[in-house]
Design a protein with these regions (language model features):
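Residue-level preference for the first positions of well-ordered beta-strands
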Residues: 7, 108-110, 147
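Domain-level recognition of soluble alpha/beta enzyme cores
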Residues: 126-165
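Terminal, non-globular segments
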Residues: 36, 93-97
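Active-site-proximal alpha-helix that buttresses catalytic centers in soluble enzyme cores
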Residues: 2-86, 127-131, 142, 176
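Hydrophobic packing residues within well-ordered alpha-helices of enzyme cores
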Residues: 65-69, 95, 121-122
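Short, solvent-exposed aromatic-acidic interface loops
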Residues: 164-175
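A glycine-rich beta-strand to alpha-helix segment
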Residues: 106-128
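Glycine-rich phosphate-binding loop signature in dinucleotide/nucleotide-binding domains
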Residues: 47-49, 102-107
Length: 176
């Protein structure tokens, strides 16, 4: 199918608790979070998940999550990486608008972002019809270092609710 696209959503790995001296934006990954991000990276590499375009929130924890994927060897060739301030705590609608702006030549895209928006976007894309175990897990929660993979059979500009087929739900805790 000519318009088939792959979308990967990844919530950043576990970050340090908010401290008085550190803004939410600047919270780094914990040691456990860095290990979880590396595990997700290895799982992505093993599954052949290497998106062409990576849209990443500029927060420290999302940037460190991306760096862990890169260090795990996810990409043989460097992807087009776009740090987007609009992804910091973005709503599902804001993320859909960003995806709608992707050119059709982009076969595979990834967003590395934050809850609650990322979880809500994943739930909206997958819809509520299917009761496959992956859908049930998606409906329940979207913990840190969780990845979902979707196939989308429409042009990027038409991405919307119930527009995707959930292919994979993978939480780092599944890999420990």
């Amino acid at each position: 199918m000519a318009n088939m696209h792959q979308l990967i959503l990844l919530r950043h790995a576990k970050a340090a608790a908010t401290a008085a001296a550190v803004s939410d934006h600047d919270r780094p990954l914990t040691d456990a979070g860095a290990a979880a991000a590396a595990n997700i990276g290895r799982a992505m590499r093993a599954a052949g998940l290497a998106p062409d375009v990576v849209l990443v929130s500029p927060s420290v924890r999302t940037q460190q999550t991306f760096a862990a994927l890169e260090a795990a060897g996810v990409w043989a060739e460097w992807p087009n990486v776009e740090p987007l301030p609009a992804l910091y705590m973005a709503s599902p609608q804001q993320m859909r608008d960003i995806l709608r702006g992707l050119p059709e030549t982009v076969r595979s895209a990834m967003i590395i972002g934050h809850n609650p928006g990322l979880h809500e976007l994943a739930r909206k894309l997958a819809g509520t019809a299917a009761q496959h175990p992956q859908h049930v897990r998606l409906a329940e929660s979207y913990p840190t270092a969780t990845l979902t993979e979707f196939l989308i059979a429409t042009p990027w500009r038409k991405i919307g609710v119930n527009a995707a087929s959930l292919q994979r739900f993978l939480a780092a805790k599944d890999l420990a």
